[in-house]
Design a protein with these regions (language model features):
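Mid/C-terminal beta-alpha module of Rossmann-like enzyme folds, strongest
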Residues: 49-123, 165-168, 172-176
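Amphipathic terminal alpha-helices
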Residues: 133-176
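Short aromatic/basic micro-patch
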Residues: 40, 70, 133
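Flexible, glycine-rich beta-alpha linker
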Residues: 1-37, 71-72
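A conserved mid-domain beta-alpha-beta active-site/ligand-binding segment of alpha/beta enzyme cores
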Residues: 120-129, 134, 139
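A conserved structural motif in NAD(P)-dependent oxidoreductases
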Residues: 38-46
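Glycine- and acidic
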Residues: 1, 28-39, 58-66, 122-124, ...
Length: 176
């Protein structure tokens, strides 16, 4: 939730949460990701959006609901370093692939890759780019017209989110 960072009960089934956990456990992530953004739509904002739509009559009965205020991976990286002393190293595909190959050969530690294992190609490169472009311009124009505005995913939200992960012991991010 945007209000307090509380996340879904079955967090272990959430792909984004598992990716974050794997990258923290590995201590590295793909360098190219710093140039990208992530879509996060907190459930309480989505619920507010749905209620707002239901309060107004519209000839349109299909909307594409997601927060168009994307989270910069660079901001996420900076917050993890600054607020939680998490040292994540941005690595080239080649170095990260080499590191992942080594982890996969270690029976005790290979489980830390569970959050990213399905994102690997045959060469052990992580693939997080897509040619699919989301477009909710019509929906967002309508939402603006009826007075609903998506909130930005900012540093405060990331801190709440990560503190919740820490509280439920999903991720160990204690400062040492």
């Amino acid at each position: 939730r945007y209000s307090d960072g509380v996340f879904q009960k079955n967090i272990e089934n959430n792909a984004f949460a598992n990716r974050i956990k794997s990258f923290i456990d590995i201590g590295a992530f793909p360098e190219y990701a710093l140039e990208h953004e992530i879509e996060l739509t907190p459930v309480d904002l989505c619920a507010d959006c749905i209620i707002k739509i239901l309060e107004h009559s519209s000839k349109c009965n299909m909307f594409h609901l997601y927060n168009p205020n994307l989270l910069s991976v660079k901001l996420l990286y900076d917050v993890l370093r600054k607020e939680f002393d998490i040292n994540l190293v941005p690595l080239s595909n080649r170095l990260l692939s080499y590191m992942i190959t080594g982890i996969l050969q270690d029976e005790k530690n290979k489980k830390i890759l569970s959050g990213i294992i399905y994102d690997l190609d045959n060469d052990k490169n992580l693939i997080y780019t897509s040619k699919i472009k989301l477009n909710a311009d019509f929906t967002n124009a309508y939402l603006n017209e009826i007075g609903f505005h998506w909130k930005k995913i900012d540093e405060d939200y990331i801190v709440k989110y990560m503190n919740y992960f820490k509280k439920i012991k999903f991720i160990n991010i204690d400062k040492e």
